[in-house]
Design a protein with these regions (language model features):
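Surface-exposed acidic/polar loop and edge beta-strand patches at domain peripheries
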Residues: 1-199
Length: 199
């Protein structure tokens, strides 16, 4: 692990093993802005006009992988993550913690653990409530992928009827979701989604 400058942000952390590498911003976030095979391309989308930005009157996407709190709500969900984050080094990784949001009292944290030997990274997402009252919310991790990628979403093991009569999966459908979109493909053991902005 090393501290580096990346994309206009002066305080970033580079983690790598023999297979993959990732870059975490400390100037904004918590956010992973780069993930790829060693010598390969970043699988995350980046928006060049937003790289290195640390101040704005509005929320910016930046790309990469981030943490929100669900359910989505304006303006709560879109609190700008443009302040420095606390970075704590752990074995084979980092814990990246945002200051509590003044508008919500919620603090976002991502724990990042890179496998020492495999092309694998494990993330733990946490929402920490600093209010004197309970907050009903859920961690919502979002990855903005580069064009041309394919996501494979494994489904739980199948089973015969009538032994297995309870549902094992849920799909959330928004009012604007179009299940006939050709980027969605449904198979017996997985769902495939193709990233193609032209569609």
């Amino acid at each position: 692990m090393e501290k580096i400058s990346y994309g206009g942000w002066k305080n970033c952390y580079h983690l790598s093993n023999d297979h993959i590498e990732l870059i975490v911003t400390a100037d904004v976030g918590p956010r992973i802005i780069y993930l790829g095979l060693i010598g390969g391309e970043n699988i995350f989308m980046q928006f060049p006009d937003q790289m290195g930005v640390t101040t704005s009157d509005e929320w910016l996407n930046f790309g990469g992988h981030r943490l929100w709190h669900a359910p989505e709500s304006q303006p709560r969900t879109y609190y700008p993550d443009m302040e420095p984050v606390l970075v704590q080094e752990i074995d084979h990784g980092l814990v990246v913690t945002q200051k509590p949001e003044p508008t919500t009292g919620v603090q976002k944290q991502i724990q990042i653990a890179l496998s020492p030997n495999e092309p694998e990274v494990k993330l733990i997402h946490r929402l920490i409530n600093h209010n004197l009252w309970g907050v009903e919310a859920a961690p919502w991790s979002i990855s903005v992928m580069s064009p041309g990628g394919i996501a494979i979403l494994p489904l739980p093991p199948r089973g015969p009827h009538p032994e297995f009569i309870l549902p094992t999966s849920r799909i959330s459908i928004w009012p604007y979701t179009n299940l006939s979109d050709p980027r969605f493909k449904f198979f017996e053991k997985y769902i495939q989604i193709t990233q193609d902005a032209a569609m």
